[in-house]
Amino acid sequence: MPTASPRASARSRRADAVSGMPLTLDAALADVAAEIDRQFDQLLAIPDDPRADLYRAMRHAAIGGGKRLRPLLVFATANLFDVARECSARAATALEAIHVYSLIHDDLPSMDNDDMRRGKPTVHKMFDEATAILAGDCLHALAFEVLADPATHADPFVRIELVLDLARAAGPNGMAGGQIMDIEAETTRFDLNTVTRLQQMKTGALISASVEAGAILGRLPPEGRVGLRGYAHDLGLAFQIADDLLDAEGDEAVAGKKLRKDEVAGKETFLSLLGPERAREQARMLVDQAIAHLHSYGKEADLLRDIARFVLERDR
């Protein structure tokens, strides 16, 4: 008897509730994407003054497109602790604002010099370079404005911890530090340990912050977050290996962005250092490890498990 593919089984299974709504993985992805678009639409209303193009640029980058994986991780983790939907939505929007700001700046001529992102022109192509820089700056600021607002959580200590954790994830010991290492990789040969550290910072830090945000909203004490942190760590590395494979083997029309950039730039990646088969094997092992970290949560963590499997199967 033929068996269903892992992709089909993960996506058709009834996953646990996202803020009280029982959803399949596909439905959860769609629901969170719509919620994040709604949040950005409210936060980025276009003013009738000279700042209008700045807001249009932010909306161009932030609304529509993208996997919304980081926001989904916030929702799925917060749901373990019955966090109110609006609290999860605001924290998830802040995480996505940081991610989108990083994409805007990453696409600039001084960085990756990309023309397409999420299937549409990059912000500096649609507007201009100065507007793109400022749009990224504003989304960066917006993230912390949202987290610091009492509407995100009534407890000021929860809000402070959210701000602190995201600041660390986005700064020189996280995403920005990983980005400068990625630039150095164009002229310096990195070994596997250095590439792993680079990707833990550039990609993994924000994925970890997304899971951490859900735990913070749920007021889970730090000593209770060991399993979730292990899940996020392994998921982040698996995500990057899958991204390296997608960059080398994917379809640009489906991915909505330019591919094979790392090979052209001569950068060492998990794929170049391990080869395709070992890289796939490593990604599968990391996903299995990530799922194992969730053993204490039972069926309530099925959505997080499905997200881990989805990371290996995505095509964009």
Label for each model-derived stretch:
Residues 31-35, 44, 48-292, 299-312:
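Mg2+-dependent prenyl diphosphate-binding active-site environment of isoprenoid biosynthetic enzymes
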Residues 8-12, 77, 296:
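Local alpha-helix boundary/kink/capping signal
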Residues 2-44:
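N-terminal amphipathic/basic leader segments beginning at the initiator methionine
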